Amino acid sequence: MNQDHPEFDSEDLSQNPPETDPLKAEIESLRSEIALVKADALRERADLENQRKRIARDVENARKFANEKLLGELLPVFDSLDAGLTAAGTEPSPLRDGLDMTYKQLLKVAADNGLTLLDPVGQPFNPDQHQAISQGEAEGVAPGHVVQVFQKGYLLNDRLLRPALVVVAKHD
């Protein structure tokens, strides 16, 4: 027993008074609630950051492919100019030179906007970029390689806009 204060016993100090047990329980409850709120805040912050990244990616894709419709509608024009150049032959003439300049200028403008021409003669057949319309025999061309292109294909910023229509060399 404590002599100055007989109401306090040293054994009593190790035991908690009855009113502190509910306080400890409330403190533990609040601590667990704080931990939950912190976890929720971290999760919300991560979700917000992921949403920002997704929006930035979507905006970048929208910018990269905004002219997809226009360039897609120009593909028949490229085809017509290419066919006109083929029909004009190789003899120089003012008409052929004008067609050639127009075709090259149009291709440059399209290339500046992300369009890439696929003209795969002699390359291995790539089902991601080529559409085989037939097989043919060709000397000097390895089997599975493109022998002829019926219609050129195009990529827009490395995404297929139109596959090249090709003839593939037969396997022996």
From Swiss-Prot:
User: Which Gene3D superfamilies does the record associate with it?
Assistant: 3.90.20.20, Head domain of nucleotide exchange factor GrpE
The protein's matches in PROSITE patterns, at most eight in alphabetical order, are given as: GRPE (PS01071)
Where is the segment annotated Disordered?
1-23
For molecular function, the Gene Ontology terms on record are: adenyl-nucleotide exchange factor activity; protein homodimerization activity; protein-folding chaperone binding; unfolded protein binding
Instruction: Print the keywords alphabetically.
Output: Chaperone, Cytoplasm, Stress response
> What SUPFAM superfamilies would the database entry show?
Coiled-coil domain of nucleotide exchange factor GrpE, Head domain of nucleotide exchange factor GrpE
InterPro entries referenced in this protein's UniProt entry, alphabetically? GrpE, GrpE_coiled_coil, GrpE_head
**GO-annotated cellular components:** cytosol
Q: Name one GO biological process term.
A: protein folding
| Cell compartment(s), UniProt | Cytoplasm
Where would you find the membrane-spanning parts of this chain? none
Family the UniProt entry places it in = Belongs to the GrpE family.
Q: Which NCBIfam families match?
A: PRK14140.1, PRK14147.1
Stated role: Participates actively in the response to hyperosmotic and heat shock by preventing the aggregation of stress-denatured proteins, in association with DnaK and GrpE. It is the nucleotide exchange factor for DnaK and may function as a thermosensor. Unfolded proteins bind initially to DnaJ; upon interaction with the DnaJ-bound protein, DnaK hydrolyzes its bound ATP, resulting in the formation of a stable complex. GrpE releases ADP from DnaK; ATP binding to DnaK triggers the release of the substrate protein, thus completing the reaction cycle.
Q: How does it assemble?
A: Homodimer.
Name of this protein: Protein GrpE
Species of origin reads Xanthomonas euvesicatoria pv. vesicatoria (strain 85-10)
